[in-house]
Every structure is written in structure tokens, then in C-alpha cells.
């Protein structure tokens, strides 16, 4: 899949996408198997978007409050970094800007709790 010129132009300033997991990459629901294993439903289209971003030089980082093995596995599959157990996402954003030398205006954040 190739990014259209129109979308590419709009995204020129974006160097990094930060996204929450629960409620953004999932529907917010939690499922448990009979053995009490946590399960989450991820949308395949979101995975395709992360792949498309990577192919076009835009990294994706997952920021999540939870410490879910399921979320870690999803990040690994999509070759995205994940920071879990993050209670203060604004503080983590500031830390990432400094460590990665990225201006906040060059970051797209997708979340339901900031």
C-alpha cells in the first residue's frame, strides 16, 4: 500500500506517532479465557497503518498505563516501541521529546485519556 501524495504532504511535519493502546488500538473491551489469560481485540487496519507509517519513515510508539503481555506482543509484532505502566503520559512525552530530539509539533498523539 502506497501513501497518497495528499496524505504524504499533510504528514510531512510528523516524525513520530504516539498512541495509547486500550480504547485506541483496541475497542476498550477486555476478555479473559477460562484460564484467566487476558485477551484484547486489535484492529488489523491499525496494524496496516503502523506498517505504512514505518515504510514512510515515521516511527510509532505505544504509551499505555497497563502492563499487558498482549499489548507488548502487539507492539513487537508491529515493530513498534512500547512504554507500559505510564501513569503520566504528558511527562513521558516531554522525556521522549528531549531524548529523541523531536519538537512536540512534530508528534501526532492518538489517545483517549490526555
Locations of regions flagged by a protein language model:
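Non-catalytic pre-domain segments flanking phosphatase-related domains
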Residues: 1-21
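Short acidic active-site motifs
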Residues: 6, 49, 92
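A positional/architectural concept
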Residues: 25-55, 65
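Substrate-recognition element of Asp-dependent hydrolases with the DxDx(T/V) motif
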Residues: 50-74, 83-84
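Short beta->alpha linker loops
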Residues: 66-67, 87-88, 111
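Short hydrophobic/aromatic-enriched beta-strand-loop microsegments
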Residues: 79-87, 106
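Conserved Lys-Pro-Asp/Glu-containing loop-to-beta segment of HAD-superfamily phosphomonoesterases
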Residues: 93-114
